[in-house]
């Protein structure tokens, strides 16, 4: 628990509110060697970095495929868990029989980090990749007085329950692996990898990774502001962008977002169907008004508000409310496209940035100053 008190002073929000809202940006090493946040404006930098890495025989790492790919904040998240279980109690995936437990997810990553710490320290000292560190290297480092630490009794590179209970710096009950197995949150033949290994599959089973709805209930309930959702998205990004490993259903959604601008693949011309039957006209920017400067508000309808039957009722109600209140507004019509949030939550950060950049251009051209939204 030694990390608890400094951790609670490092809130992401300057207002010290819960870390809900936008996901953390995807950070990559730019062509100048500096960490660069991926945005629609830095996509060219990512292309240049990937070309430079390919020429040098390396690669640009996107997302967290190994424990060392997490930021210091991510690693601190894992070490600060108090094991209160509030996140698990409120998790909709856990409460509907899915294998995901936010608590066990964090503890598995924490225990893996504690187990592979000797390999990470040795790799840094010897200038090699953690996967290249051998038992002989560890023995030499230990003989030379290197601060390695060591789990005992590993079996085939996996940590036993007793090992996890002895892991340096891990403050847990000592039976996390037993809890993971009982919850079916870890495959019986795997456990928690005690050697450097890919996170997806070796530490976090695929079913666990893709069961998260990214609702944020775990973050909202956490007394120390651990950002479970961002850690899930970090691993998903690596799986989607580096491994192309994701549920088949997401492939269809990605294609529809890219080609049609909405998750269902419906035609853009149907975006105004929600307004049929209203006793007043809904002005469309570029058709009925030149730009948003001619009205009080731009009404951003969103994909669900335009296409989904239940959400259409909400859209109509908001439009009627604005009309009754005498507030002038206009919509973008078929110029509107998805915000890209579904792609971002699923780990496809590049598609998200493409859609976000497109929307920024659209809103800039529309001269939007004040926007009303109903989409979540």
Residue ranges and their predicted role:
Residues 3-10, 49, 53:
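Short, small-residue-biased leader/transition segments that mark boundaries at the very start
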Residues 9, 23-26:
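Active-site loops and adjacent core secondary-structure elements that bind or stabilize anionic groups
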Residues 13:
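Phosphate-binding active sites in nucleotide-utilizing proteins
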Residues 30-33, 50-51, 57-100, 204, ...:
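Non-transmembrane accessory domains of multi-pass membrane transporters/channels
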Residues 85, 93-95, 109, 226, ...:
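Active-site proximal loops enriched in glycine and acidic residues that flank catalytic Cys/His/Asp
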């Amino acid at each position: 628990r030694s990390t608890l008190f400094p951790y609670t002073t490092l809130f992401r929000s300057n207002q010290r509110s819960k870390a809900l809202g936008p996901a953390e940006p995807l950070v990559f090493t730019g062509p100048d060697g500096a960490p660069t946040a991926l945005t629609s404006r830095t996509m060219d930098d990512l292309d240049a970095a990937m070309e430079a890495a390919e020429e040098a025989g390396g690669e640009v790492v996107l997302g967290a495929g190994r424990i060392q790919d997490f930021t210091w904040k991510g690693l601190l998240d894992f070490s600060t868990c108090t094991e209160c279980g509030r996140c698990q109690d409120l998790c909709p995936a856990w409460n509907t029989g899915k294998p995901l437990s936010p608590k066990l997810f964090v503890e598995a990553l924490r225990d893996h980090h504690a187990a592979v710490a000797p390999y990470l320290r040795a790799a840094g000292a010897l200038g090699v990749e953690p996967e290249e560190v051998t038992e002989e290297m560890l023995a030499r480092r230990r003989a030379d007085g290197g601060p390695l630490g060591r789990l005992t009794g590993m079996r085939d590179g996996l940590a036993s329950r007793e090992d996890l209970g002895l892991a340096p710096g891990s403050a847990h009950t000592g039976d996390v692996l037993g809890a993971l197995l009982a919850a079916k949150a870890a495959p019986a033949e795997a456990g928690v990898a005690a050697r450097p290994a890919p996170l997806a599959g070796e530490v976090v089973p695929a079913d666990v990774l893709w069961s998260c709805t990214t609702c944020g209930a775990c973050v909202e309930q956490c007394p120390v502001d651990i950002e479970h959702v961002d850690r899930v998205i970090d691993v998903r990004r690596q799986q989607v962008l580096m491994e192309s490993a994701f549920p088949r259903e997401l492939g269809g959604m990605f294609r529809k977002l890219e080609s049609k601008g909405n998750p269902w693949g419906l035609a853009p011309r149907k975006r105004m169907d929600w307004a049929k039957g209203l006793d007043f006209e809904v002005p469309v920017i570029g058709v009925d008004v030149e730009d948003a400067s001619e009205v009080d508000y731009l009404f951003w309808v969103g994909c669900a508000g335009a296409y989904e039957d239940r959400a259409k009722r909400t859209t109509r109600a908001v439009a009627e409310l604005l009309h009754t209140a005498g507030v002038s507004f206009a919509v973008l019509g078929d110029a509107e496209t998805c915000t890209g949030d579904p792609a971002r939550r699923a780990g496809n950060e590049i598609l998200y940035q493409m859609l976000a950049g497109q929307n920024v251009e659209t809103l800039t051209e529309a001269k939007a100053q004040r926007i009303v939204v109903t989409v979540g």
